[in-house]
C-alpha cells in the first residue's frame, strides 16, 4: 500500500488539530459541573457518559494525519486509566495544553529535544511534590470522600467506602449489574470459590440447600480420590476426632464418593467433597493458597505425601465452611497470620513482576482471597443507558478509592496542580535555554485542569486560576458550590496516584508530539485507484 508523508511544521500542525479535536470532546466533562457526551453505537441505543477514557476510545478521525495526534492523546487517557483507573480527563487536558504551548515555541525556533527535556524534568519535580504533599487515607469516611468526588454521587461514595473498609487493602471490590433498581453491596467473608458439592446428598440444611460444617477439618488433594482403601484410614481417624471433613480434590469419585455419601445419609460422618477450582498450574497454586489459609498441607504423591499414609496433622482447619451446589466459602481458616502474610507478600511480588493484564487480574483475585475479602457492588438503574453510566461511575469510584489508599490524597479540583508550581522554583536554577522554556511550558499547562473545571461551571477560568494560585495549600475552588475554601475539609480531594499518573503520562505524550519531524500514513484506497496526487495542507 502506498504511503503519504508530511514533514516538519505541516506534520506537527496536523497532529495538533487531532489532539485538539479529541481533547475538546473530552474536556467538557471535567469537574462536578461538567457536561455529558453522547456516543452513537453501531448497535443498541446511544451511550451517555462523562468518563474521559470512554469518550477517547470512541474517537477515530477521518484525516489520517490528524488521527495520529488524536491516537497519541488517546494513549494518555488509556495509560492513566490502566495505572490509576481515573483522572483520564485531567491527563487529556494537560496533554493538550502542553502540546499547544510547546508547538508554539517549536514554531518560534526552540529546540524540541531540549524543550521536551525541560517538560520531563518539570513533570518529575511536580510528581515528587504531589507525593510529598499527600495525606494518607485509611478510614471509611476518607475513602468515601474520594469515591464521591470521582462518581459525583454520595450514595456510590458511601457504598465504595463501606466495601473497601470491609475487605481491607488487598481485598477485591468488583462491580456487577443488578437485576433490581437498587444499588447494593454484598460482602463475602473468608475464602470463596465457584465450585460446589459433588453430590446433593451432602446437604445438611435442606431449607437453604447448603452443607454447613462447623469447626471442620480440611483435606486438600492434588489428584483424584477414587480408591476407598486409600481414603479409609484417614476417614477413621477423622471419625474418632468427631469433626466434620471438607475434601477438596481434583475429583472425588467411585468407591470413595459412595462411602462418603452413605456416611452422610446415615449421619455417621459429616463430610463434603468438592472439586478443586481452575485447571493446571492455577489449580495447583490455588490449592497451595488454601493450604496456607487453613494451616494444612496439600496431599501430593510427587513430594512423598500419600493419602493412605497421612494422619490428621496434614489436615487444615476452619471455623466454618458453607458449601452450596455451585460455591464454597471457608471462614476463619486455621492458618497462621505470619504464613498468610508471607504468601501475600510473595503474590504482591508476582503482581509487580508480571506483564500480562490477565495474569495480574488472577493474581490480584488470589491475593484478595488470601486477605479474606471479596465485595460485590451490584448496580441498579431504571434504564439500560442509565445503568451503563452508573456502572462506569462505580468502577471509576472503586479505582479512585484504591489509588487513594495506595498513595494518599491531595487537594482536588485542579488546585493541587496549580499549587505544585512552587516545586518548579528550585528547578529553575538548574536549567537554561530551551530546557528552561520547557519548564515554563509545563508551568503554564498546570493550570489547564482548574481552568476547565471553572469554565465548565460557567465562570471565567483565568480569574479562578489567579485566585487559587494565591491561596494557601489545601484551599481552592469548589465547583460544586462555586465557592473558594478549604477543599480537604469539604471532601474535594483527588488520589495522588491519579494526579501523578496524569502529569507523567501527559508530559510523555507531549514530548512525542513536539519531537515529531515526519508523519507517515497509509494512502486512502480510493485515491490510489484514481491515481490522483494528494496535497495535504492545514491552515495555521
Curated annotation (Swiss-Prot):
Family that this chain belongs to: Belongs to the chaperonin (HSP60) family.
Transmembrane spans: none
Organism ancestry: Bacteria, Bacillati, Actinomycetota, Actinomycetes, Mycobacteriales
Keyword field contains Ion transport: no
Quaternary structure (record): Forms a cylinder of 14 subunits composed of two heptameric rings stacked back-to-back. Interacts with the co-chaperonin GroES.
Keywords: ATP-binding, Chaperone, Cytoplasm, Isomerase, Nucleotide-binding
One function term, GO molecular function aspect: ATP binding
Catalytic activity of the protein: ATP + H2O + a folded polypeptide = ADP + phosphate + an unfolded polypeptide
E.C. number: 5.6.1.7
One Pfam match: Cpn60_TCP1
InterPro entries referenced in this protein's UniProt entry, alphabetically: Chaperonin_Cpn60_CS (IPR018370), Cpn60/GroEL (IPR001844), Cpn60/GroEL/TCP-1 (IPR002423), GroEL-like_apical_dom_sf (IPR027409), GROEL-like_equatorial_sf (IPR027413), TCP-1-like_intermed_sf (IPR027410)
Protein name: Chaperonin GroEL 1
Cellular compartment(s): Cytoplasm
Summary of the function given for this chain in its UniProt record: Together with its co-chaperonin GroES, plays an essential role in assisting protein folding. The GroEL-GroES system forms a nano-cage that allows encapsulation of the non-native substrate proteins and provides a physical environment optimized to promote and accelerate protein folding.
GO CC annotation: cytoplasm
Residues the record lists as binding ATP: 29-32, 86-90, 413, 478-480, 494
Species whose genome carries this gene: Mycobacterium sp. (strain KMS)
One of the protein's GO biological processes: protein refolding
Amino acid at each position: 500500500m502506498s504511503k503519504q508523508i508530511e514533514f516538519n511544521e505541516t506534520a506537527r500542525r496536523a497532529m495538533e488539530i487531532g489532539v485538539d479535536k479529541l481533547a475538546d470532546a473530552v474536556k467538557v466533562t471535567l469537574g462536578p459541573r461538567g457536561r455529558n457526551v453522547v456516543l452513537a453505537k453501531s448497535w443498541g441505543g446511544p451511550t451517555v457518559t462523562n468518563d474521559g477514557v470512554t469518550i477517547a476510545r470512541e474517537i477515530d478521525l477521518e484525516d489520517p494525519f490528524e488521527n495520529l495526534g488524536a491516537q497519541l492523546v488517546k494513549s494518555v487517557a488509556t495509560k492513566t486509566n490502566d495505572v490509576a483507573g481515573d483522572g483520564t480527563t485531567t491527563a487529556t487536558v494537560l496533554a493538550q495544553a502542553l502540546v499547544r504551548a510547546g508547538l508554539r515555541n517549536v514554531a518560534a525556533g526552540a529546540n524540541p529535544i531540549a524543550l521536551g527535556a525541560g517538560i520531563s524534568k518539570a513533570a518529575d519535580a511536580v510528581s515528587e511534590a504531589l507525593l510529598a504533599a499527600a495525606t494518607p487515607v485509611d478510614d471509611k469516611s476518607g475513602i468515601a470522600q474520594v469515591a464521591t468526588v470521582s462518581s459525583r454521587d454520595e450514595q456510590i461514595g458511601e457504598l465504595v467506602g463501606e466495601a473497601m473498609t470491609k475487605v481491607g487493602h488487598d481485598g477485591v471490590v468488583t462491580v456487577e449489574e443488578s437485576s433490581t433498581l437498587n444499588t447494593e453491596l454484598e460482602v463475602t467473608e473468608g475464602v470463596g470459590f465457584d465450585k460446589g458439592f459433588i453430590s446433593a446428598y451432602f446437604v445438611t440444611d435442606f431449607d437453604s440447600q447448603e452443607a454447613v460444617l462447623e469447626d471442620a477439618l480440611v483435606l486438600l488433594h492434588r489428584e483424584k480420590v477414587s480408591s476407598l482403601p486409600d481414603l479409609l484410614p484417614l476417614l477413621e481417624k477423622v471419625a474418632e476426632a468427631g469433626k466434620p471433613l471438607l475434601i477438596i480434590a481434583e475429583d472425588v469419585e467411585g468407591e470413595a464418593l459412595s462411602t462418603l455419601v452413605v456416611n452422610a445419609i446415615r449421619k455417621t460422618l459429616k463430610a463434603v467433597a468438592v472439586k478443586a477450582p481452575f485447571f493446571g498450574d492455577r489449580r495447583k497454586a490455588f490449592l497451595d493458597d488454601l493450604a496456607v489459609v487453613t494451616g494444612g498441607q496439600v496431599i501430593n504423591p510427587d513430594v512423598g505425601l500419600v493419602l493412605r499414609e497421612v494422619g490428621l496433622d496434614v489436615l487444615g482447619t476452619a471455623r466454618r465452611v458453607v458449601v452450596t451446589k455451585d460455591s464454597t466459602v471457608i471462614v476463619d481458616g486455621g492458618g497462621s497470620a505470619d504464613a498468610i502474610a508471607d504468601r501475600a507478600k510473595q503474590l504482591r511480588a508476582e503482581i509487580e513482576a508480571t506483564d500480562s493484564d490477565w495474569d495480574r487480574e488472577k493474581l490480584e483475585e488470589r491475593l484478595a482471597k488470601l486477605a479474606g475479602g471479596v465485595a460485590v457492588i451490584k448496580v441498579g438503574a431504571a434504564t439500560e443507558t442509565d445503568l451503563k453510566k452508573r456502572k462506569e461511575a462505580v468502577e471509576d469510584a472503586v479505582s479512585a478509592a484504591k489509588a487513594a489508599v495506595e498513595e494518599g490524597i491531595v487537594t482536588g479540583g485542579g488546585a493541587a496542580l496549580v499549587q505544585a508550581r512552587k516545586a518548579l522554583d528550585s528547578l529553575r536554577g538548574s536549567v537554561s535555554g530551551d530546557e528552561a522554556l520547557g519548564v515554563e511550558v509545563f508551568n503554564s499547562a498546570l493550570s489547564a485542569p482548574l481552568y476547565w473545571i471553572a469554565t465548565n461551571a460557567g465562570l471565567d477560568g483565568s480569574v479562578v486560576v489567579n485566585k487559587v494560585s494565591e491561596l494557601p495549600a489545601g484551599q481552592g475552588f469548589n465547583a460544586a458550590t462555586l465557592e473558594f475554601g478549604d477543599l480537604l475539609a469539604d471532601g474535594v480531594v483527588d488520589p495522588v496516584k491519579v494526579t501523578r499518573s496524569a502529569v507523567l503520562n501527559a508530559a510523555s505524550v507531549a514530548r512525542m508530539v513536539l519531537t515529531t519531524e515526519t508523519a507517515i500514513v497509509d494512502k486512502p484506497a480510493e485515491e490510489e485507484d484514481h491515481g490522483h496526487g494528494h496535497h495535504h495542507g492545514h491552515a495555521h
